[in-house]
Amino acid sequence: MKDDHLIMAVHVTDRLTKASQVQALLTEYGCNIKTRLGLHETGPDACSPNGILILELVNGAEACNELLQKLNAIDGIEAKLVTFSH
């Protein structure tokens, strides 16, 4: 049986003030992040203060759940974990 496929979605409000806290956690759990995709609205005259991160996680659910709890402890951050079993 293959390992579960773990995907985390992280909604970041006020990216300018929250990005450093989020980045510190992503660095701390860097060995558990296989893929990272950042999305936010941008244009010639504006850049959205909000954003979404999509993370593909590896190396088991325990560390992923720790990351989830730490991200959700930051005011203005909402993280959700989706587990796909094979």
Question: What spans do the regions from the language model cover?
Answer:
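Long, contiguous binding/interaction regions
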Residues: 1-86
